Each structure stands twice: as C-alpha cells, then as structure tokens.
From Swiss-Prot:
It comes from the Bacteria. GO terms for molecular function: ATP binding; ATP hydrolysis activity; ATP-dependent DNA damage sensor activity; mismatched DNA binding. The keyword DNA damage applies. SMART domains: DNA_mis_repair, MutL_C. Belongs to the DNA mismatch repair MutL/HexB family. This protein is involved in the repair of mismatches in DNA. It is required for dam-dependent methyl-directed DNA mismatch repair. May act as a 'molecular matchmaker', a protein that promotes the formation of a stable complex between two or more DNA-binding proteins in an ATP-dependent manner without itself being part of a final effector complex. One of its GO terms (biological process) is mismatch repair. One of its GO terms (cellular component) is mismatch repair complex. It comes from Dictyoglomus turgidum (strain DSM 6724 / Z-1310). This is DNA mismatch repair protein MutL. InterPro entries: DNA_mismatch_repair_CS, DNA_mismatch_repair_MutL, DNA_mismatch_S5_2-like, HATPase_C_sf, MutL/Mlh/PMS, MutL/Mlh/Pms-like, MutL_C, MutL_C_dimsub. The gene is mutL. Keywords: DNA damage, DNA repair.
Length: 572
C-alpha cells in the first residue's frame, strides 16, 4: 500500500466539484439558486452549446462586496448558515458554500457584482485560481459567466451527453424553477435566441400557461388544501388526461424542487382507481411544511430530501389529491347544460335498471336500435339530453346544449358497478344463490390453500365452494346477479379472483375482487344496446356523478364542446 498523503487543494476542489457539478445544468442550478437567495426579481439565464461553451446568469439581487465575492470562491464560504442548528432549519436554496468554488475549479469564470452602496467588483478565475481582480461599474446585482466547462477535466467532458440532451436538461430546470418562483421574472436565452420570459406577476397559472402547450393547460385541475402546518397547492391532470408511462411530475417542498418517492406514491394513492396501472399523472405540486421537518442535507445536489413525519405527509398529500379529483367530478357534471325547448322521449314500459344493466348475457340484441313507431306513451330522458345513438357497438353519443359526449359503455358501466358493489359490500347487501349445476374448477394445492385461507372474505362477496378432490373445487353459490351467467363466464371470473388471491394486503385484495366482479358484470364492448338501455346508462352516469374513469383508470367519457367543433370546421 502506498503512503497516505493529504491531497493538494486543487485536486480536492476537483473531487468536490464532481459531487456538486455533474453537468452543465448543475452549474445553472447552483447559480440560479444563489440569485434567488440574493433576493433577485429578474434573472436571465443564457447558455451556448448545451452549456459547454458558455453559461451566463444575470440577476438584480443584493450583490456582493469585493471581500464577499473573493470569499465565495472558496469552499464552505457561505452567508446562509452559521451554526449546526441552522442545518436543521434551512430556508435558503443554497447553504453549503460549495457552488461557486466548485464551478470555478473546473471552468473559466468571470464574476461581476455590486451592492447598493459599494463599488462593483470584477474577478476572473481559471481552474480555481484567481487571475484578475478589478473594479466594475455596473448596476446592483450579479453577473456570472462560466466558459469552457470541464476544460481541465477532459474525462468529465467526455462523459457528457449530446448537446440536445444537455440543452433539454437546462431548459427543463429553468422551467421548474420559474414555476416555483412566479414572482420572479425569468428569461432563458438558448444559443442566442430567446426561449421564454415569464412576467414575474406572482401567478403560477400564468407561468404554467406560458411554459406548457394548450392541451396540458386545459386539462389541469387546481389543487389546494391546508391542514395544520401543512399546505399543498398546484395543478394535477384531470382523470384520464395527460397520463404517461414515464413520471411527469414537478414536486416542490418549501419551494425546493425535489424528487421524493413518498410524494409520488401519495399522488398515485390519491388517483386510486382513476389511473391505469403503470401510468403516471401530470402533476405540479407545492408542499409547504415546517422547515425543521425536512432534511435537505441528504445529498450534495440537494434534490433528495427526507421527511421527519413520512406517514403524515403521505396521508395529507393523498387526501388532497382525492378531494381535488372528487371536486372535478362534481364540477364536470354540474357544468352540463340540458337542451332547451326540446323534450326527448322514450318508451314508458321499460325494464328496471337492474334488468337492463346487470347482466351482459341479456345484451345479445339482434334487432336494430330503432324504437317502435306505434307506441304512444313516452317518458322524458331525466338529464335533458338527446341520445344520438351508438357507434362501433361500444360508444354512445349524447348531445346537450353546448356539448357532445362520447361514452364508452363498458368502462362507464364498469365504474357504476364498481361503486355499487363497494357500497353493497360495506352494507352487507351482497346475496348469493345456489347455481343449478355446480361448477368444477381446477386449482393447484397452493391456490386451494390460499382460497381456504381467505374463505371468510370470499363469502362476503357471496361466493361459496367445497373441495372436490385434491386439485379441484366445486363452486356451489355465486352472487345473485351472476346467476344468469353461463358457466364459462363464472369460471373466468373466479380464475381472475384466484390470480389475485396471493395479495397480502386484504384491503387491496378486496378492491381487486370488486374490480373483477364489476368488469365481468358490466355491459360488454360489442353489445348492441336499444335506446332504453342507453337512456338508463346515461341517467345513471349523470345523476350519480360517478368518477370519470373506469376502476382501472381508463376514461369513459370524452367531452367535445360546440366551440371546439366550430373551430375545427373554421366557423369561428
């Protein structure tokens, strides 16, 4: 083993820079956060060639004196913390005193800064070594220009991604920080071209409208809730809208942009039964809580944080998301306007709701969707809508005063059945009946053991069975409304339940079983409906104001405004 030596300051700085300055966007982040901490109201970020050639950050903050500017170029020089206790009550974005020194050690830096009362200073640094110090006759604030990033660390430059990737990372960061501070005007200049400039008027909605396209802006729900010392606000995507297989979240804790799995899982819990498995909603979430309950000193990048009270944060966030989505469901239905001066009528002698919509076996209609001409007694469609008809044997088109709705009949009825089954289960209303010909199903020893373990739970769902040899069970009783199912349909449902039976969380298992039962008992895609059946379904949707997705998270209703149609056909 070689002799242990103390590394020279130059090498120590480069190692430290490797932790703080990973790529060009790290430079932008550190400099912009310093500008915010300095009280800036206007911040201009400019970069060239993905930040490798130039990164410039200009602000109108409080500025630095000559002494402070020189000191800032040394590691662990900061005005933001003074004692160990300060580490547990951090209110600024920067606090370690590493940023400028780390940047200067791996690039060529020019610092220009001036306070309100003292002369300005110009400092030129190369590779962490000060080359020049002069007076600067500028206005109050700070200008920092970073040239030739990693010029003296070729290995680091070699591992940078493409110019496009590095550019996108910088643009994304400035977008994120601009949303966190809508009261600050941010300007972004990329390769000499103005990318965007925010107004700094303090309105988050205006920043979101500027930074994202109209589709995103029009499909967001406002989020706001306060409970004790916890506050959450921001925007989340409407049910079934703006979902993606990739995480598309903007999380902020005390206005610090972070990555945090607790928040992510809480949001997904809030979207429970409204989000497709494996998908993520679009979210811009600001969480405010006491500073001492958040540890931001977990990693040099300050992106990772720890909550002192993880359970409380999780429950607060998930509840806020669910309440916002519930409110959106109510808003959606309350905004529906019935047709004026038109009474749309239907047959009076229709079947009950249960008869019409409970059993998919009853929907094998061979006739066309036409009402008999010779019936004289009618009833009005309760919601004041006009059913245009059914298309592709799955979608119902409904007209109101200023909207057209296209409804997925299976997904909509599946949600109705899901809500009904949940209620019936909680009240103990599910009843079972003996099937005429007991159904024998093949199961493995492990599956049989799990079924017997959860027998009490499954009996709550009105299923009953008995052993029928070492590898079979015989189903004797099923829920009442499954009585008219053919044996194959019942077997498919029970096999689906068996596949979920290994779930250890009983509440999740219950929910999975309810979903399976709802799916199997709902109207199927491909079932041709008569107008009576469509009317019952539409009335249930709009009267009960059910959530706008099926239990698995797929949207079941598409709203198209008259205005959208007229714009498409260039009528306005």
């Amino acid at each position: 083993m070689g002799k242990v030596i103390l590394l020279p300051e130059e090498i120590r700085n480069k190692i430290a820079a490797g932790e703080v300055i990973e790529r060009p966007v790290s430079v932008v982040k550190e400099l912009v956060e310093n500008s915010i901490d300095a009280g800036a109201k206007r911040i201009t970020v400019e970069f060239i060639n993905g930040g490798e050639t130039l990164i410039s950050v200009i602000d109108d903050g409080e500025g630095m004196t000559k002494e402070d500017a020189i000191l800032a170029l040394n590691r662990f020089a900061t005005s933001k913390i003074k004692t160990e206790e300060d580490l547990y009550n951090i209110k600024t974005l920067g606090f370690r005193g590493e940023a400028l020194a780390s940047i200067a050690s791996v690039s060529k830096v020019e610092v220009r800064s001036k306070t309100e009362t003292e002369d300005g200073v110009f400092i030129k640094v190369e590779g962490g070594v000060i080359q020049e110090i002069n007076l600067w006759q500028g206005s109050k604030g700070t200008v920092i220009k970073v040239f030739d990033l990693f010029y003296n660390v070729p290995a680091r430059r070699k591992f940078l991604k493409s110019k496009t990737t590095e550019t996108n990372l910088i643009v994304d960061f400035v977008k994120r920080i601009a949303m966190a501070y809508p009261e600050i005007s941010f300007q972004l200049i990329q390769d000499g071209k103005n990318k965007f400039i925010t107004s700094g008027n303090g309105k988050l909605e205006d920043v979101v409208s500027l930074l994202f396209d109209i589709e995103i802006h029009n499909n967001l729900i406002f989020l706001q809730r306060k409970e004790g010392n916890y506050i959450i606000e921001g925007f989340i995507s409407k049910p079934g809208k703006l979902i993606s297989l990739k995480s598309q979240d903007y999380f902020y804790v005390n206005r610090r942009w972070v990555r945090n799995n607790i928040i992510l899982q809480a949001i997904k819990e809030g979207y429970k039964n409204r989000l497709l498995e494996g998908y993520f909603p679009f979210s811009i979430v600001f969480l405010t809580l006491p500073y001492h309950e958040v540890d931001v000193n977990v990693h040099p990048t300050k992106r990772e944080i720890k909550f002192e009270k993880e359970k409380e944060v999780y429950e607060f966030v998930s509840k806020a998301i669910k309440e916002a989505l519930d409110s959106e469901d109510k808003r959606f239905f309350s905004g529906v306007k019935a047709l004026e001066g038109k009474e749309h009528k239907n047959h009076v002698g229709i079947k009950t709701e249960k008869e019409l919509l409970s059993l998919p076996m009853e929907f094998e209609h061979k006739s066309e969707n036409k009402l008999s001409e010779d019936i004289s007694e009618y009833i009005s469609l309760k919601s004041g809508f006009r059913i245009v008809g059914q298309i592709f044997d799955n979608y119902i088109i409904v007209e109101t005063k200023d909207r057209v709705y296209i409804i997925d009949q299976h997904a909509a009825h599946e949600r109705i059945r899901y809500e009904e089954l949940k209620k019936e289960l909680s009240l103990g209303y599910l009843q079972n009946v003996e099937i005429l010909f007991p159904l024998v199903i093949e199961v493995s020893e492990e599956e049989k053991e799990l079924l017997n373990k959860h027998k009490d739970l499954l009996e709550k769902f009105a299923f009953s069975w008995e052993d029928f040899g070492p590898y079979h069970i015989r189903i004797i009783r099923v829920p009442y409304e499954f009585l008219k199912f053919d044996s194959k349909s019942i077997e498919n449902l029970f096999q689906e339940i068996i596949s979920d039976i290994s779930e250890k969380d009983l509440s999740k298992l219950e929910d999975k079983i309810i979903k399976s039962m709802a799916c199997h008992s709902a109207i199927r895609s491909g079932n041709i409906l008569v107008r009576e059946e469509m009317e019952v379904l539409i009335n249930l949707i709009f009267e009960r104001k059910i959530p706008l997705t099926c239990p698995h998270g797929r949207p079941y209703i598409w709203e198209i405004s008259k205005e959208e149609l007229e714009r498409y056909f260039h009528r306005r």
